[in-house]
Swiss-Prot record:
EC number: 4.2.3.4
Residues where Zn(2+) binds: 183, 246, 263
A GO molecular-function annotation: metal ion binding
Record keywords: Amino-acid biosynthesis, Aromatic amino acid biosynthesis, Cobalt, Cytoplasm, Lyase, Metal-binding, NAD, Nucleotide-binding, Zinc
Pathway: Metabolic intermediate biosynthesis; chorismate biosynthesis; chorismate from D-erythrose 4-phosphate and phosphoenolpyruvate: step 2/7
Family per record: Belongs to the sugar phosphate cyclases superfamily. Dehydroquinate synthase family.
Cofactor: Co(2+); Zn(2+); NAD(+)
Protein name, per record: 3-dehydroquinate synthase
Gene Ontology CC annotations of this record: cytoplasm
Length: 362
């Protein structure tokens, strides 16, 4: 088992990474008599809910659970209300613990509930997808979507612990594994050139879920994110760099309807658009743009815009992005592989040109 610590100004919390952690009662920082509400979905529940309940009950906990429908389109205010109702009906107090057992949607929704139920209760993240293990479970971002924009209603709320059981990836559909690799590649592209080179050498092993490669990959991603969050917990500075490709990607998700493209798929195409725009601005080289494109393709990820979207469809969605300040578009771009920056007030004509260069052609 590996442990990565997230060091915040006022406290710290551990990220445990290993095989078989969900069934090991020693993984859980919960004492006899504690009350727990597990938030999950039917897809995850069929594999892991009984395992987690059994481990918690061995520790003497009182365990309830609530099932949300599966999918990004259920990352809504209505799902929040389902969990609030379950907590209230079962008389959970301020001393309860919420466990988010699932992927990014479950983590975001359960996290927002933990932030707001009785003004805040303890949260444990148990991510079961690669994307949530390397990204969304770490750092305290919680949110639900609005029909006009992704992640527009939320809060920063740190978990007390993240428990990453790499065995859960064995039941993950290949498409979901590939989507998670988009966020993995992002870390190398923005902050760690050596890790990007490692990915070029080992991406096939990650696609095939080789245990040693996976454990190294997940721990490195968590360490990179932990370091960024320690410097900038609420995204006032460096943390914005973690959004490479996300402004373009969120536009794709919102325009197509949540869930039609997976988040990682949209981010993959968004990273290509950001890289092409960076090259147009004279930053990253054509050769490095090609390296990024080839690595994404080897991870079976899209690198061109959906054929149902026109370049002009992007900007209205992008102008609702949370990084927009005073009506000016701000984008995360690349100086080089391993070095990102935030560009302020990027010329819309150049943005559209970059999108056109990433548009599907027959």
């Amino acid at each position: 088992m590996l442990c990565v610590n997230v060091e915040l100004q006022e406290r710290r919390y551990p990220i445990l990474i290993g095989s078989g952690l969900l069934q090991d009662e020693r993984s859980y920082p919960i004492k006899r008599g504690d009350r727990v509400m597990i938030v999950t979905n039917p897809t995850v529940a069929q594999f892991y809910l009984d395992t987690v309940i059994y481990a918690l009950e061995k520790r003497g906990c009182v365990v309830d659970h609530v099932l949300l429908p599966d999918g990004e389109k259920y990352k809504t205010l209505e799902s929040l209300n389902l969990i609030f109702t379950a907590l209230l009906q079962d008389n959970h107090g301020r001393d309860t613990t919420i466990i988010a057992l699932g992927g990014g949607v479950i983590g975001d929704v359960a996290g927002f509930v933990a932030a707001s139920y009785q003004r805040g209760v303890r949260l444990i993240q148990m991510p079961t997808t690669l994307l949530s293990q390397v990204d969304s479970s770490v750092g305290g971002k919680t949110a639900v979507n609005h029909e006009l924009g992704k992640n527009m209603i939320g809060a920063f709320y740190q978990p007390s612990m993240v428990i990453i059981d790499t065995l859960t990836l064995n039941t993950l559909p290949k498409r979901e594994v590939n989507a998670g690799l988009a966020e993995v590649i992002k870390y190398g592209a923005i902050l760690d050139y050596e890790f990007f080179e490692w990915l070029e050498q080992h991406i096939d092993e990650l696609v095939a879920l080789h245990p040693e490669a996976l454990q190294h990959c997940i721990s490195r991603c968590c360490q990179i994110k932990a370091d960024v969050v320690a410097r900038d917990e609420t995204e006032k500075g460096d943390r914005a760099l973690l959004n490479l490709g996300h402004t373009f990607g969120h536009a794709i998700e919102t325009h197509l309807g949540y869930g039609n493209w997976l988040h990682g798929e949209a981010v993959s195409t968004g990273m290509m658009m950001a890289a092409v725009l960076s090259e147009e601005l004279g930053d990253i080289s054509i050769a490095d743009v090609s390296r990024l494109e080839k690595l994404l393709a080897r991870a079976n990820l899209p690198t061109v815009s959906p054929d149902t979207m026109q370049p002009e469809d992007y900007l209205p969605h992008m102008m609702r992005d949370k990084k927009v300040l005073s009506g000016k578009l701000r984008l995360v771009l690349l100086k080089s592989l391993g070095q990102a920056y935030v560009a302020n007030d990027t010329d819309h004509t150049l943005v559209l040109n970059a999108i056109r260069r990433c548009t599907q052609t027959d």
